[in-house]
Amino acid sequence: MVATAVTSAFFPVTSSPDSSDSKNKKLGSIKSKPSVSSGSLQVKANAQAPPKINGTVASTTPVEGSKNDDGASSPPPRTFINQLPDWSMLLAAITTIFLAAEKQWMMLDWKPRRPDMVIDPFGIGKIVQDGLVFSQNFSIRSYEIGADQTASIETLMNHLQETAINHCRSAGLLGEGFGATPEMCKKNLIWVVTRMQVVVDRYPTWGDVVQVDTWVSASGKNGMRRDWLVSNSETGEILTRATSVWVMMNKLTRRLSKIPEEVRGEIEPFFMNSDPVLAEDSQKLVKLDDSTAEHVCKGLTPKWSDLDVNQHVNNVKYIGWILESAPLPILESHELSALTLEYRRECGRDSVLQSLTTVSDSNTENAVNVGEFNCQHLLRLDDGAEIVRGRTRWRPKHAKSSANMDQITAKRA
């Protein structure tokens, strides 16, 4: 009913011509009165511009309504033109609605202060420097920062891993496997990391955009070195440097393999002849045991979400397990500035692990390193088999960390 009423306001219902004519005729001696529809909207015909014939304006005589015997004029006959709705009323209503909506929007005053924090115009990156370097930007998300309001070390490591995979894809080397070339897929080979070295000069914060550059080089006869350089995309400040060594492993036998010539032919054109972005940490990693470890965390087990597509624990997860045994006072007053990891064997989903840590003062005489701590780490299975050996370096977060440093020293004593 409402729809009918609204429609009739713009498109009036007309009576049939027969009934209209019959009302205008004389019925015996009674003269009919003109019928006027109360809901109709009429348009004057003589309001239109006069027509032109052969370039000459032709005069027209306004159409007059018919007159009855009393001399009263009857309305002009109904046509399609004078039954059209008054569109000006409809346009005025639409304009009013838009103006009201615009006013309401202005009252909200929603204006983002930093567009770079809410806009993510990043794809999978691009190949630069003659096709040898891959570059990709990342925006630091709110769920990627920790208690210090800075990106966690796991976030940075995930960025390194993501750029490595995207580098292979952009170079056209990604086969059916995860990070494996077509020839590697044919031979059931995968890449595994054996050594990782990272130095963090400064951690990015929420909303920062970091640029990660990565490239690969040869490492001996059967290895590949991958380097990363992380910087602030706006200022160019170097934030993180990392280098790693990778070797091949047979996915079925889980044994290390030499690089086949077919695979070497695929990857060598992308090798960059350059020195490592970090000098190799030549200091030997110490093997801890129950007698030398100061902090032990037992009962660590992988979750299903910790496994990658190759059905072994993601190497980034190992870092989280190593830090499980780091003393809380160090985590509260210091930040991780460097780490060196040696991966000894893979870890499956049914493994049960132990994390061991021991703390030592910085053995350097450089005054810049005053207040720093070095930690030795071991991640092992319950049966004693080594998974990862590691060393981390921690620097004070701020000048007020001296109280926590005294607490750490007291606990060790």
Swiss-Prot record:
The keyword Lipid biosynthesis applies. This is Palmitoyl-acyl carrier protein thioesterase, chloroplastic. Signal peptide: none annotated. Residues 1-57 form a transit peptide. The gene is FATB1. PANTHER family: OLEOYL-ACYL CARRIER PROTEIN THIOESTERASE 1, CHLOROPLASTIC, PALMITOYL-ACYL CARRIER PROTEIN THIOESTERASE, CHLOROPLASTIC. It catalyses: hexadecanoyl-[ACP] + H2O = hexadecanoate + holo-[ACP] + H(+). The keyword Hydrolase applies. Its main location: plastid. The active site is at N310, H312, C347. Its EC number is 3.1.2.-.
